[in-house]
A protein has these predicted regions:
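Nucleotide donor/acceptor-binding cores
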Residues: 1, 86, 132
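Alpha-helix N-cap/helix-start capping motif
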Residues: 9, 34, 68-69, 93-94, ...
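Short beta-strand and adjoining strand-loop segment in the mid-core
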Residues: 29, 125-144
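Short, hydrophobic beta-strand segments that form beta-sheet elements in well-ordered domains
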Residues: 27-31, 88-91, 136
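NAD(P)+-binding Rossmann beta1-loop-alpha1 motif at the extreme N-terminus of oxidoreductases
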Residues: 1-50, 54
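Rossmann-like NAD(P)(H) cofactor-binding subdomain of soluble oxidoreductases
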Residues: 44-124
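Short, charged/polar "capping" segments at the starts of alpha-helices
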Residues: 35-39, 96-99, 141-145
Length: 146
């Protein structure tokens, strides 16, 4: 499965690095900030884009790694795209998968995947993620795949 991200903060960047270092294909990370695209990409070897289409079309799994209070709004945007069969996940510790309202109608599968882990920064947090515990809640039918 190919993984993409919306949101380039500590959680998104740390999970991105963890997946890459563990040979899980990552399609890139959507960010609203053009400066992040042009500057950080060269330093970190991450693929950033300001085109949500690029991330959505290439990804089987999409992580919404945005602040908790932005998840619902980002989801409202994501669900306007053809996402049938995709796994849509957020990493909030305070919100369940129900924040992805109407996901059944899109044909996608929703999950809350919360790492019980202190993300100290974008550059090194991924190194200790193998020891982290995760709570996973969402679509029961595809739980083993996620």
């Amino acid at each position: 499965m190919k993984v993409g991200f919306i949101g380039a903060g500590k959680v998104g960047c740390s999970l991105y690095d963890y997946f890459v270092h563990n040979n899980i294909p990552v399609t890139g990370c959507y960010t609203r900030t053009q400066a992040k695209v042009s500057g950080t990409e060269k330093q970190t070897q991450k693929i950033f884009t300001t085109s949500i289409d690029k991330i959505l079309t290439k990804s089987d799994v999409l992580f919404l790694t945005v602040p908790d209070d932005a998840i619902a709004a980002v989801w409202e945007l994501v669900k306007t795209y053809p996402i049938q069969g995709k796994f849509i996940c957020h990493c909030s510790g305070s919100l369940g998968s129900a924040v992805l309202s109407g996901i059944e109608e899109t044909g996608a599968y929703g999950y809350s995947i919360h790492p019980m882990f202190p993300f100290k920064g974008k550059k090194t947090a991924y190194e200790d993620l193998a020891q982290a515990l995760f709570s996973v809640e969402g679509n029961e039918e595809h739980m083993e795949e996620i």
